[in-house]
Amino acid sequence: METFGDLVAADDVLLFVNAAITATGQREFHASAGEQSLSLDFLHAYMLGNYRDLYAGVLALDVNDHNVVLIVRRLLETSGEATAEQRRREGRLIAARLASLPPPRVYRLFGALRRARVNNRRTRAIMRDWLAARPDPALDAVKYRGAFKAALRHAHLPPAGAELSDFLFSPHARAHYAAPLLETWRRAHHEKAALYDLPYTVAEGFAARQGVPRAVFLERIAPRMTRTETLRLQESALRHGAADVRADLTRMPLTRLASYVLSLPLEDRVRRRAELTGALEAAARRAAGPLRGRWGKVTAVLDDSFSAYGSGVKRRRPLAVALACHHLLGALAEDYTALWTSGRDDALLAFPHGPTPLGRRIIDALDTAPSRLVIVSDGWDNAPPGLAAEVLRVWRTRLDPARRTSVVHLNPVYDSGGFDVRRLSPTVPTAGIRDAEDLAALVELAQFAEGRTGLAELTAYLEERAARLLARTTDDRTTDDRIAHGGRTR
């Protein structure tokens, strides 16, 4: 029998998970960066102080990288408060999750631990194991030289070999390096041709110091760029006349691709309609995987109101999530209907505009008699205010008490004032979402927010996700680093 305390704990964990998925401490449409950070810091301190085991278990869920780093840092800072068994379990989760983070973020975490003087044995062991697992220490030494050197010092680790040690601590002492990448870096100081064999971020500094024209540099460094760098720079490269910098859009992750599409002017989207739509649909099919076409009849209510602009630092992020969810739901469903709050029916030309008439769109969606209704919105229903909550209440309590239609609200925006994502109705489960690729898992998680979920059930779910994470042996996030050293992905 669940106690009242267990029910409160389950609700607290779900609230924190929603925050950890969506919040990044950056400015949102309705809240400043300071408000976001203050709210998020309180939640982390509250969870760590009251539910340490569950707090660590959240690492196994699809929380964003910003909150992964915050969780890891707080767990390592408070190692003395954990039991031996807790430290063992936390260490395994931390190691598994760090392996999935981009290297720059991990190095920034190590730097923060060094500045905070967190240097216990467990911290040094985690740093040692992560550094030992890096596929190419020479690449890290060139690309992240200062951070790499600081991490070795903090963890009391020697570099892997005398040559790497010389490169890190006295790089100009040698007249020649045997490691090809280190030798390329040495030659790039006086040979312009050598810089094009370096990773883009390193070569860019050499090019600026040597006065290489931007267009020439971008044309020649293009084969060394990672997929993300190519996507980010291709429009800038075109403006400089470097036409060879072209990203393979069919290989891009869905949400990142949606952000890129929305960054283009409307006339460019019209001109490239076939290319962009094809790439979005291909990414959606990859994300759907074995669930493709198995969700039955699905209707989505998608928020493209003015608040979907987000903020200057998260420009159009809520709208990008909605656009990506639109294409993913189309791949998951056997029969799919999309209803945008603006009333537009051309998703490719979406842009943030107007109020948020969620209530009216939900009525239209329920008229289609779907087996699943998915609402992707920041929850600021304002045309008229409160209509969505009343529609959902009447639907759930009067018209569909048997729950023939599954309704879930996915919210990409953290509400700092409420310490959670903004909910539309107590009768409908709400989950935070950051990347559309996580949609299926989040719909699964949202079921715990429906009704009064017990702590035992939620704990079992976290343990199952932790087992899945620990069983994973591949590190997908190292691919871009290997590409930067060995060339572009085919």
Where are the regions that the model predicts?
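An N-terminal, globular interaction/scaffold subdomain
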Residues: 28-165
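Acidic/polar low-complexity segments with low predicted structural confidence
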Residues: 115-292
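Acidic, glycine-rich A-domain
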Residues: 1-87, 266-476, 480-490
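Generic intrinsically disordered, low-complexity segments enriched for polar/acidic and small residues
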Residues: 1, 13, 26, 39, ...
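Alpha-helix capping and helix-coil boundary motifs
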Residues: 12, 101-102, 226, 253
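Generic hydrophobic segment detector
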Residues: 48, 55-65, 73-76, 88, ...
